[in-house]
């Protein structure tokens, strides 16, 4: 079983996409807002975001160890936060240039390492394509992981 990270700015469509993907893979869902709420930790500083990435990683690894596919959606704004999260497959939801929160916009570093690049808010279109790529015996056998928005 594997862990998928769906990352991007607030309002980009991460949760919507993850919610569309989960039933296609019979996956367990981890939503960063819900995990943060359960921990009652509303610190959005760099240190708070590291704690959140570690919490998300711990929860994802527990579900994976129980034999589940896991889809986690969270901002993962920095390379450090992304390194802390044990994703087997990374989806960058890159549909907006600025999110709702200025501090997050300032902190967010566009990912360099990802397996799929979503460029439009069309989760019903993207979810099956991502799941096909993810479950393909050799994902690189498909023409590209950066499918055009018209695909």
Report the location of each language-model feature.
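Pre-Walker A (Motif I) flank of P-loop NTPase domains
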Residues: 1-3
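Conserved substrate/cofactor phosphate-moiety recognition/catalytic segment
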Residues: 19-58
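Hydrophobic anchor at the beta1->P-loop junction of P-loop NTPases
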Residues: 6
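Conserved lysine of the Walker
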Residues: 14
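Conserved small/polar residues in nucleotide/adenosyl-binding loops
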Residues: 134-139
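The conserved Walker
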Residues: 10
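Glycine-rich phosphate-binding loop used to anchor ATP phosphates in small-molecule kinases
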Residues: 47-97
């Amino acid at each position: 079983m594997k862990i998928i990270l769906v990352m991007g700015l607030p309002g980009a469509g991460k949760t919507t996409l993850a919610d569309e993907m989960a039933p296609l893979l019979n996956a367990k869902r981890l939503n960063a807002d819900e995990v943060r709420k359960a921990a009652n930790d509303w610190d959005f500083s760099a240190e708070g975001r590291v704690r959140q990435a570690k919490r998300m990683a711990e929860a994802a690894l527990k579900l994976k160890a129980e034999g589940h596919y896991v889809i986690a959606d969270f901002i993962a704004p920095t390379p450090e936060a992304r390194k802390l999260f044990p994703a087997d497959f990374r989806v960058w939801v890159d549909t907006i240039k600025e999110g709702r929160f200025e501090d997050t916009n300032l902190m967010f570093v566009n990912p360099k390492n990802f397996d799929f690049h979503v460029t439009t808010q069309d989760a019903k279109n993207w979810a099956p394509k991502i799941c096909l790529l993810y479950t393909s015996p050799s994902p690189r056998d498909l023409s590209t992981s950066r499918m055009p928005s018209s695909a």
